[in-house]
């Protein structure tokens, strides 16, 4: 991009996934499509809550091209671990055993991918002593959508913001800043709640909804609901908004305003 060699690169203020314009042969007819790419690292979440961290690694990666109205059809997973055969008593204080992280993370990733129906065509796990200090969990996805299914316009006063997805809970509160905190031997006892509980079935419903051009063409601007919750996902939609947090559907009663505003779930 810096060298001006990406003539097909799509520039938009919807900064969700890298997008390029391509020509696709659809049963002999040439059509203009968008091809979207996204990768996501979930090193910290997977280390403290392996199942949820790995499952939301792929789920979170899907969200970005999906918010670009694309159908995500392919994935890749690259992970890094210390020797999973290491003796339990050699586990670093405040860490989960390498075997526990590796096996549980694999189950978490597979669980989400199977439920949403996403093919992961490349998987590689790298073993190195350096990953004992910090796990590596990288997910990558690709998606595509016909160009004429996507409408991009600036929001105007009077436009409505519609949230689509699961209900809000305390899981996912603090996830945006969690990986930047100072960690110690006790962190694992309290930080796992920062990892959002994934909902593959709900996300699959959104994928199916977005396969209808009569739906996608209604959308002026779309954003994925990531770390930082409402305050980020909706805050990035326009320069000035009125947000009524009481309107948010919740998993249970008792959430305060801050939790409603920043929960990733």
Residue ranges: model-predicted function:
Residues 1-265:
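Glycine/proline-enriched, intrinsically flexible loops and inter-domain linkers
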